[in-house]
Amino acid sequence: STLTALFAGYIHATAKETGLTVGVVDIDDAQNTIGKMRLFEATQQESLDEEYQVMNISSSEFIENMDFLKENFDIILVDFPGNLKQAGVVETLMMIDVLIIPFEPSKIEIMHTINFFDYYKANIMAKREELGYKTTVRGLPNRVVPNLIEYKDLVANQNEFPIKLMEQHIKESRVQFQRNLSTLISNYNHVCDEFGDEMVQLITEHIKA
């Protein structure tokens, strides 16, 4: 949810230069973090006319809303739950062109990330390829302490890692993110603009490929 809000804020903040519109879909029925955040912030704001749109759509209803989303937004960001158990999550993943997998560079997190990617590659990515869809997947080291040996080992051996890593990583800044995380453009603090730049480049390359 943090990364979704950061990238949505970046796209919206640079919209005058790029002309891109962004819509955020929160399909996490249980936590609904971004959806709840926007509802709360809406009570603190006179108008949301200048804000990007946040939509609470259950994963079981995502596909039937695809036409509306494609017609109204250049970039659609989907905030997923942390597991595949929720109804419709796998089907929604089938619709995703660019998948970013954030993970902490710890042994347990890396193990879970590889297990998820193996499932995704065999059961979702393979089916997308059969149907003629291009898919771009990147791993994003998250909550990184650069001097930790686990992160250094990950970077040093990234050619052996099954998921291609993004060039950027998100540093450990839980307190800063918790204090400043927002869905309102007036609160966007440009803390991860480099991540936003790389994401736009990644999406652009995916479209051109």
Label each residue range with its predicted role.
Residues S1-T2:
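Walker A/P-loop
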Residues A5-L84, L181:
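P-loop/Walker-type NTP enzyme "switch/lid" segment
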Residues V25, V78-D79, I101-E104, R138-N142:
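Conserved beta-strand segments of the P-loop GTPase G domain that flank and frequently precede/overlap
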Residues A87-K107:
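Inter-motif core of Ras-like GTPase G domains
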Residues T113-Y133, N142:
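Conserved C-terminal guanine-recognition region of P-loop GTPase G domains, centered on the G4
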Residues R143-I185:
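Beta-strand-loop-alpha "switch" segments that mediate conformational coupling across diverse proteins
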Residues F177-M199:
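C-terminal boundary of histidine-terminating zinc-finger modules
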